[in-house]
Amino acid sequence: MNKRDFLKNSAKIAAATSLSFSGIRAVQAQAHQGYQVLNPPVNTRASDKVEVLEYFWFGCPHCFAFEPSINKWADEKPDYVDFVREAPPLNPGWEPHSRAFYAAEIMGVTDKFFDPMFDGIHVERRSLRQPDKIAKFAGELGIDEDKFRKTMDSFAVNTRMKQAMQMAQASRIRGVPSVVINGKYLTGGSLAGSHDGIIRVINERVAEEYALL
């Protein structure tokens, strides 16, 4: 190798090293700010709104503890923000609760079912792990028990669970609660440090995304 080639190769290595360190610094900066950039971004439901998507599990105590913060935020959010939830069965033991969430969604009874299900598990300490017990619980809430049981085991619920898992994998969801802002930014307790930190990240990223609509 002559001197000219050596210098050219050295320059390329230096440039590549610089880019590598720049990438590391960018990731570190994102983590310090409480979020991670999703690259590539994940598709959202509507292009004319900023989507905020929470991933959760009914059996998760951290999700239950986060509910007052995210509910307060949802009550006060601007009209241009679309808030949605997904309950993918990231662990096989989560499946009955995922089925319950999507059954309630498909039957149009989420408002009747969502908060009582959380309270039943975490406040009343009820054992709501088996489909039959969950369906019976739904019946106590004035929901058609038999229909709820059948819907939990339906093709429609299977499809929604599969979609939720695909979305979670694309969004690099490893635990809950996790929040994805407009398919581009991932945050959660481990990244933002606290419930208030998660809400701060949501508000900052929403404002930035709204400016791009």
Residue ranges with predicted function:
Residues 2-92, 207-213:
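Extracytoplasmic thiol/disulfide redox context detector
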Residues 5, 140-213:
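C-terminal cap of thioredoxin/glutaredoxin-like
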Residues 50-51, 78-81, 112-115, 142-145, ...:
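A short alpha-helix capping/helix-coil boundary motif
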Residues 51-54, 65, 69-72, 95-99, ...:
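Extracytoplasmic/secreted proteins, especially bacterial periplasmic and envelope-associated proteins
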Residues 59, 74-77, 104-108, 117, ...:
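Sec/Tat-exported extracytoplasmic proteins
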Residues 59-62, 89-93, 119-123, 157, ...:
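Solvent-exposed loop/turn segments at secondary-structure junctions
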Residues 76-107, 111-138:
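Structural microenvironment flanking redox-active thiols in thiol-disulfide oxidoreductases
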